[in-house]
């Protein structure tokens, strides 16, 4: 090969390598600088492990059995929870650490954490028995986080990260299950589901406004799942050996979600520079329930842990048997989805977020 041809070939290879490198960087570039998580057990990645007052902890097997190292670290699933899945799909990080975790790294502070607490809800009453950290108290942790972030990157950069971070909120089922359906203490004050839904939406409104005042701008709010299809609710309302979804509770979920869809644009219009997205988790879950074979599920009416009818938190423990194939169950315990289900839900929410960014 002549010298001139060698030079041309070398330039071609160099250009190709640079192009491939740019393309790779483009695909792995995080869509947000950080992810900040608030809510309940669906997004609690271990805060309750370090919250001594609560009885709701998932720091024992079989929780976490399919995580690297087979380590139970506070996630209410056999593996990742939805907050991890979303963070991974958006190229932010593989696992979202809990804020209360001791010795959390500077890098994890900078790229985001979870403030969620299993057992929490928008209604503080939801945490009375479990002593979980209510959603209303999670901004206190967030304020401590902001102070730590400023100490790492400085005031200006910290606020830039928070302004551009993706905020994900997942809460609500505990409020209705613990206060209205199974333990109807709130029915004395709110006789109809409509009244209690309005109360919860008002609490949500105040919560997101507080986050906005602290610098959050990109806020994703999860709707309710089909609550009547949670195994524990099917058990609570079971009248014979056959198990069916509780249709009224599903209808209530749909009604609440419709109200939330209407509410979020109203909040956004009143908060300059804010961007709100309703995350639809109802439809993907219902599709999995109605068309299980499409997703590789063989069981959708009970969890993988124990009988699958009641077991959750301390009732799902190292002495409890689990199903042989974890990925063919929609639910891991009587309330929480399996990692396989969270992955499918995550795909759906990821598509929503990407469409939202482009809009």
From Swiss-Prot:
The signal peptide annotation in the UniProt record is 1-28
Molecular function terms from GO: hydrolase activity, acting on ester bonds
Give compartment(s): Secreted
| Superkingdom in the source lineage | Eukaryota
EC class of this enzyme?
A: hydrolase
Active-site residues are: 41, 333, 336
Q: Principal place where this protein is found?
A: secreted
Q: Which Gene Ontology CC terms are recorded?
A: extracellular region
This chain is glycosylated at 103, 325
E.C. code:
3.1.1.-
Question: Some GO term, biological process aspect, for this entry: which one?
Answer: lipid catabolic process
Key words, A-Z: Glycoprotein, Hydrolase, Lipid degradation, Lipid metabolism, Secreted, Signal
Q: Which Gene3D superfamilies match?
A: SGNH hydrolase
What the record says about family reads: Belongs to the 'GDSL' lipolytic enzyme family.
What name is this protein filed under? GDSL esterase/lipase At2g30310
The record lists the organism as Arabidopsis thaliana
Q: What is the lineage of its organism?
A: Eukaryota, Viridiplantae, Streptophyta, Embryophyta, Tracheophyta
